[in-house]
Amino acid sequence: MVLELLKNNYERNDEHYYNEKVENNTSKHKKKKKKKKKHILVEESEKYDRNIDSENNEEAYNAYELIKTKPNNIYEEKYDFSFQNLDKKCLREKNNMRESYRNSKDIIQYGTNENDIFTEDMLENDNFDDDSFVEDDTMDYKTYNSYTKPEFNLFSKYSTESKKKNIMNNKKHSKIEDFYKKYKNNSEYSKQANEHDASIIQFLNNNKKSVDCGKMKDINFKKNDSQNYSESNKYKNEFFKNYNYDNKYTNNYAHDNNQDSNSYYYADENEPKDNHEEDNDTGDTYADNEEDEDNRDDNDDYSQYNQCEVESDTNQIRPNEKRYNESIKHINDSNLKINKELLLKRETYTKRDNIFYIKKDIIPYKKEHNNNRFSLYDSSKNNNEHNNNYEIKFMNYKKDSEKEGEQWLKNIKKEKDEEFLKKYMYENALKKTHSSKDLQFNRLDDEKNILHHDINVDNKMVRLDKYERSNIRDMRNKTNKCNMLRHDTAEFNKIRRKDEINNYSEYANKCLAGNIYEEDDSYILKRNELGHKELKVIDNPILNINPDDKKKPNIKSFLDKIKYRKNNELFLKNEHEKYVGIQETNKKDKIKMKFADILHTKNFSNFFHRGKNSIAKSLSPNNDKKNTSFNNEVFNLNILGKNDKNSDYKQYNINCSPYDHENTSFHPSVREETKYYENKESRKRLDYNCDEDNYIENSIQRYHENNIDYNSINIERTINLREDIKYNEFLNKPDKINSENFSNNFNDNKQKSLKNDDSNKIRDTNKLYYHDHLENTMRSNYIQKEYTEKISDILESNSNNMRKFINKMDYYTKKYEQNLYKNDEDIYTKENKFPDSRKEFYNKSDSPMKVTDGIKDSQYENYNRIKYKLKMKQEKQDKEDETDINIDKKLSRKMIENNKLKEENESNDELIVTPFYIKSKIDKVLKNSEIFERSARATFKQFDVKNKNFLHFSEIESLIQKLCYNLELPPVDKKILSIVYKDYDSSKNNCMNYMDFRQMYWDLLKQIKKKYYPTKNFKIKRNCIISRKKLQGYDYSSIYNYLSFKKILGCGAFGEVHLVEDNICKLYKVVKILKKKKMKNIKVNEEINVLIYLDHPNIIKIFDVYESVNCTYIVMELCEGGELMNKIKKPQIFSETYIKNIMFQILCAIAYMHSNNIAHKDLKPENILFKTDGYDTLKIIDFGLAELINKSEGISKTAAGTVLYMAPEVFKKKFTIKCDIWSAGVIMYFLFTKSLPFTGNTYEEVKQNIFNSEPDYQFLKLKMSKPALHLLKLMLEKDYSRRPMAAVLLHHPWFQGYFDPIDILPSTLNNIKSYMKHSNIRNVIVNIMAHELCVINNHVKYINDIFLKIDSNHNGSLSHREIYNVLSNAGVKKWDINRIIQALDVNDKGCITYTEFIAGCYRWKNIDSTFLKAAFNKIDKDEDGYISKSDLATLVHDNGVNNKDIENFFISVHSIKKNITKDKKINKISFEDFKDYMLSTF
């Protein structure tokens, strides 16, 4: 009890303790005078007002008492104790610390200075009364987080003369700094600079920075060229792309040799590169986004200058761009000159040469130029980026044609060949009736290339559309034009053989004829089909042949000329025959036009028959001839296509897409639907529907709605129902239902039998419709029966594909709907409906179906029964969906409620007074004499109610009780208080005056502070526990002094991992060796700094770091349980409870990292290890890609990680720390299903799946509970703004069991209470031992579980409030709680870390001596085998540490020995002495 201390320390020598100290210190104060005035308070403030050794304060106060009696002017001039001389810089530092305690866990981030001692400014609370510790009950006693006026100045009430001097000096100093700072290229200061300053900055940047850059680069820096790109860059400049002609894609990710085959690492291509060369090593997962520390200072100016200049120069054309534009313009000018010559030659010649040219985009990475497909009508794929002219040759395909190309190009340029070509082309032109038609020549601007003959190129095969060609006169209005130019064939014609001449000339004649109704429109295509050959496009650019070569005699060309002349007569005969055939087809076209008009009158539905008459076929809407008239296209019902019997297209495979028929080499030939108008249903359509065009439009719409799955084609081909004789008998019956009007694969496969069947003729139109309907029903029933029997085997073997096929076969359900109702009820989907036509038919009173009422009733009953079942299934599914939605809402609401409850608990107004708040309040009163005087006088007046200027014992008793309550002290013993009262009462008549009370009040506060709220002068930072040593020399010999290598555990591109044994403490550990030569651009220190700072039970610990010239050695804890991936690969199925435990630990570690703004960026099962085989404690490793994301921005652009686990926003290179949540969701999916949710064979395929696909959540309902599924959906949310943080997810109802009340074992409470009784230096040593504690047993696992449960906000550290709640529920007194909290918080940071918590809770009594040896070696910095005072000062990196505390520690160590007296000075401690002392304290 404090009063007992006062009683024992009080000495009755006619003067009180307080006044006695005044006399003793008066002489000391006179000697120092101004020196103490200037320096004492400054020294105290530089220690953040934490030095509570009150000797200096007492001296200052005593001086104040002595000088108080002097005149006022003397006091004001010479002695100023109002603390106005406190350094302004310290004031700013204190103000910066305001509210730091309330949000200490959020503010203390990675990289902060841990030397800063936590302090509390009491004036942050405007309601706090500095003058009293014993406020009235009506006063609000605020807690540490109730600060409202951080701007309030502590010393604003006092004189400011010396403060003004400091302010003026600081202003002068700041002006000088700002003057130089202004001309530094600082983006933050640039916002405050005026225009004049900006011009100066720009001048300095343009001169100094460029010179520095030139020196660094060893080049002359060019003006207006602020950014230099290397040849390896993706783009050469801002406007023109540099294509990769070798590879189609660039490899943006590297495969690590250490990782699984499916792990790919993706790095940002646009990250800034270092200025030095890199080794071409691959395989590691590091992503370097900054320059090395060695080059950072040198490159800073250059990088800033470039960054400043890029924006200003974006609109300027750089020299390399000018050269590129000039080369383009030169090519354009040359092409323009050639085309001008062509125009001149066109005027001189009356003959026409039909040369085709193609304008085509250059795709460098596709090397299939020689097999292209082109279309005369499709203009959607034109692109004017590259206007190179190419010549098309139509030739019979031969494999050896490419070998003779170069030689042939030389031979065809001869004059004699040209004259011959001119002759026969002139003769051909004379035969044409439409020779007067001149096609348009397109000329573009002078800066662009001239478009000669534009034929759009699609794919590998040549394709000419016969159905969408328009009139030649209208072709000049389209983009794709086939213009025939008159020009010199000696320069541009490259015809090789007789067959090529025939093909080319015949096609040219057809084009010149311009008759779009002729039958042989695609003459070349048919010629190709007959010869089983293909057309070929040669994309060789036009070569300018040297004119001197034309004059040289060439024997070969002469022989070719004779050969051509011999064949000329046969050629002319063929041309004449074709011309006669054209005239005949013109007559047929006129007849076609007449019957096409008749067709639209809707009066001749019975005109068509099954004969082979060509006129009848030409009138059929499904005829394979073209029926276009003046650009009015006829809809092709058989859009699926059918193989032409004379083509090699029969082996073509149709892909699973409704539009794949458009990608074939030719348009699919139209099926001859001879039964189109012969059935009753068709006639009914013509009679009752409005017109044919509307019906066709409806057919198109229904076709697109059906979205047929074309995989059914292969299934039906497998069945091959055409060979079924019984089926052919039914096919002979001409009746068809309405769905037959649609082209489907089922009918297409039977078309051959339909064509060969002579019995398919027009039926008598007078037959009753109900007979047709009965026959149709029998036919469909039988077909369906046979069909279902034959596909049963396929259904068994490929059920999933068949299910998808049936779901999409709308045309199938329409055609055989009635029969399907009877045979197979389970394959229906929601799209099955009773046909509208059949409903209307039943509703008609005069329907002939009245004759067959029995059949109708049975069918209708079946329909109602199936409809009812479908309705019930739909209702059940709707209920399940509604239940899922309600559960999701309920779970989300519950998670939000849990988080709100957590926030309310943190911000409630209960009076939970933390020890730091009380300590800071006591420190403020004891450090400032004037504040103490005010506090003592206010307390005295508060209890002197009658203003009698003295206090009775009863009043003193009430005062002490109130003081103990506010400062959370034990209750007062009345007997001891009466003794103390008598000792301090100088009047001896039960009347204590103010002077006596002031002395007692001073002594009482000092004793309270010493026992209950002591100051910790010996503090250790975490980076002091992890030692970093530099090894001497280039060899590895020195590392063997510390570690013994046992075996290699793994190796990668940048280093190796070994199992080692510590030579000193004999503990097994793991060392990661990183070779510096292979890691020039990867900062090893980033990973080391992150691991040093992070302290969590689920994150790997590091012990030591050794650095040599060649390598860096990182010593980490050993995890013997192996990777999580190894357990996933095993066939064992995990229970949901097991997965929940794993996910809880992962999310706890993620929440801790995110609270410190650290993103791991490479979470995957390979980077999650089990500590031991017997326990499921996890450790997250490999922080090589970890990044500290700025809290203000919250966005990173350094994309890195393993592709299979990367979040969608990482691919966009704009992501937050929530990318780790996505990776955890993928791991959770992996644990439940043993498969990844997003896979692919290539990087691009995986990327597209991540962006576009969703996991099969319906399948997951069978494998996990609904809360688990809801949590998984939240984690795999593609929009990261809607993806919750890890701390929020940990309050999800799935983790409800982890929120149960925490019961702390009595043994653990005893360990904590014993821990609080020892000195701070001893507890620091125990913390070092706790860090070296790398074993996992039941006791350690229990402590880990308690730590995670106490951490209610899941930020990885325990606040004083969280500890207070748990210990108070355990029955610990609040004054003991304050002492426990202060003992656990070794560094006074305001929160308790994992290592500090385990140091106080662990049972150290039976600890192995190896951990004591490890702690001893950490303290023994000079490695001489002894702990000296200098070693302790070096350990805390503070040479000014209080020597008194260290001396007390040395005395305590040697006091356990009987032979050593306390008076003997001891300067060293051996390991044996250290061991005996530590074991005695446990």
From Swiss-Prot:
Ranges of compositional bias, category Low complexity: 739-748
Catalytic reactions of this protein: L-seryl-[protein] + ATP = O-phospho-L-seryl-[protein] + ADP + H(+); L-threonyl-[protein] + ATP = O-phospho-L-threonyl-[protein] + ADP + H(+)
UniProt domain Protein kinase: residue ranges: 1043-1295
Binding site for ATP: L1049, G1050, C1051, G1052, A1053, F1054, G1055, E1056, V1057, K1072
Residues the record marks as active site: D1162 (proton acceptor)
Activity regulation field: Activated by calcium.
Region (Disordered): 250-320, 739-760
GO molecular function, one term: ATP binding
Binding annotation for Ca(2+) 2: D1351, N1353, N1355, S1357, E1362
Domain of life: Eukaryota
Comment block on domains: The EF-hand domains 1, 4 and 6 appear to lack a functional calcium binding site.
Record's function text: Calcium-dependent protein kinase which acts as a sensor and effector of intracellular Ca(2+) levels. In sporozoites, probably involved in the secretion of the cysteine protease that cleaves circumsporozoite protein CSP, thereby exposing CSP TSR domain, which binds with high affinity to highly sulfated heparan sulfate proteoglycans (HSPGs), resulting in productive invasion of the host hepatocytes.
Protein name: Calcium-dependent protein kinase 6
Species annotation: Plasmodium berghei (strain Anka)
Lineage: Eukaryota, Sar, Alveolata, Apicomplexa, Aconoidasida
Gene giving rise to this polypeptide: CDPK6
